[in-house]
Amino acid sequence: MYKRQERIRVVWSGAEYRGRGRETNWKGRVGFGGAQIQRMEKINAWNHERKLEQYNGDTVVFDAITTGNFGGFDAWLEKSDGATIDVSTNLGVMTVPLSDIGMEDVTMDAGGLERKIRVFRLPEENPHRTITTELEIPLNATGDNPLWVCVTTEDGFQAWSSPIYAFK
């Protein structure tokens, strides 16, 4: 029997614009109305002077900066039947029934350069450690085509390749 996953990931990302002064300050809270947070784990929260913590049994408060990168948290919930997720930030608000959140992103656009908050479910435990894929990538008719590969792990770390050059 299928059991709905109770692990919710909330991610904020993006920048104000390219270049200097691109920082985006995220200040807000995420409430899980009608549910209890059983456990919360931070993602890409390395600045200990910035707040990202659980408040009471149903809310996470945060004060973060992104400059094109991302941060966020995973929350493992209990008693979530009929619950909602209420995201309230200095850049916008979003309220969604938890029953409407699946493995695909539910997004709050916040302007800027790919600036947004994404909410989605993840498996309670992820047994997958490999991926194989094929992509069709349009190439320029002449000259070099530098391609980069970026791998993002579940815990938020990223690894970038050097450019891989394809040419016709």
Q: What do the predicted segments below correspond to?
A:
Residues 3-168:
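C-terminal functional module detector
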